[in-house]
Amino acid sequence: MGEGGESLSGAASRFRADWQALDPSGRVCLAVSGGPDSLALMLLMQEVAPRDFCVATVDHGLRAESAAEAAMVAGLCEMRGIAYHTLRLDLAGGSAVQERARKARYAALADLARRDGLSAVVTAHHADDQAETLVMRLNRGAGLRGLAGMRAASSVPGAGEVRLLRPLLGWRRAELVALVEDAGLAPVLDPSNHDHRYERVRIRDVMASTKALLPSGFAASASHLAEADAALEWAVERLWLDIGMSAEGSTWNPPEDLPRVLALRLLERVVMHLGGTVPRGPDLVRWLATLRAGGVATLAGVKGDARSGAWRFSRAPEHRSDRRPD
């Protein structure tokens, strides 16, 4: 058993509770790169739900070694009797390659889930990943939604109908590495995980170099913030019913003491409902200021008019170009 680790059977008992808490249904697809985190996920799932998953490895085509790494995962799956898929992409290198690879990877996994009738995509993000994400978003001045970090259950980005499950958010990286070592598996070691050109790698190294920063504490805080964000969405849902939004718009008298954060969430939903796009945060702030001042402005094809006191929302005439609120 690896240093600081636990037996696979003991870990599986713990994982079973984490997995069942996500209320999984039907077969799911595990995203397995061959790294220690995703191999540990595969080991745990085979202990807990051996008939309920398949494995998918995405070969982005960005490194010469990627085809061999995908073949390694395929070989492991064959030995263990696990159904697997290798999804090959042809991405070009260059700027923002990690973000482009992430989007393409999720799109490929979502396509597989739709095609094969799988109920969810499952990834091996863990507590250390969550802590790094939280620090990155703190550096950017993120709001509550961003600081809530990764959710244990959400939707695949760009494919809202496909569930995305992350059952390992309460697990540390070292625990997962130990499970893989104890199983005698040799994981893939991606060199980009040590490339200091990437912000996440720099943050990871700083957090590892000091005992003053506890990833488990960051991850717990992200979980608490996610609960607060869910409570905010609960309130927005109820206010949305008061607005009575139709396909053409609505007129609404907002409470005078409506908290700013609720107002911004509601305006975001108005724009998404009538304009079909997700507005930028700074534009929403300016739009809210205009409405609270009794003005009129258009944002992303949606007109907001508060000159009568009530807030009236409608689609802007198509021949007029959208302008940002003053």
UniProtKB/Swiss-Prot annotation:
Keywords: ATP-binding, Cytoplasm, Ligase, Nucleotide-binding, tRNA processing. Pfam families: ATP_bind_3. Its EC number is 6.3.4.19. Its main location: cytoplasm. It is an enzyme of class 6 (ligase). Belongs to the tRNA(Ile)-lysidine synthase family. It comes from the Bacteria. It is found in: Cytoplasm. This is tRNA(Ile)-lysidine synthase. ATP binds at S33, G34, G35, P36, D37, S38. One of its GO terms (biological process) is tRNA modification. The keyword Oxidoreductase does not apply. The lineage of its organism: Bacteria, Pseudomonadati, Pseudomonadota, Alphaproteobacteria, Sphingomonadales. It catalyses: cytidine(34) in tRNA(Ile2) + L-lysine + ATP = lysidine(34) in tRNA(Ile2) + AMP + diphosphate + H(+). The N-terminal region contains the highly conserved SGGXDS motif, predicted to be a P-loop motif involved in ATP binding. Ligates lysine onto the cytidine present at position 34 of the AUA codon-specific tRNA(Ile) that contains the anticodon CAU, in an ATP-dependent manner. Cytidine is converted to lysidine, thus changing the amino acid specificity of the tRNA from methionine to isoleucine. It comes from Novosphingobium aromaticivorans (strain ATCC 700278 / DSM 12444 / CCUG 56034 / CIP 105152 / NBRC 16084 / F199). InterPro entries: Rossmann-like_a/b/a_fold (IPR014729), TilS/TtcA_N (IPR011063), tRNA_Ile_lys_synt (IPR012094), tRNA_Ile_lys_synt_N (IPR012795). GO terms for cellular component: cytoplasm. GO terms for molecular function: ATP binding; tRNA(Ile)-lysidine synthase activity. Gene3D superfamilies: HUPs.
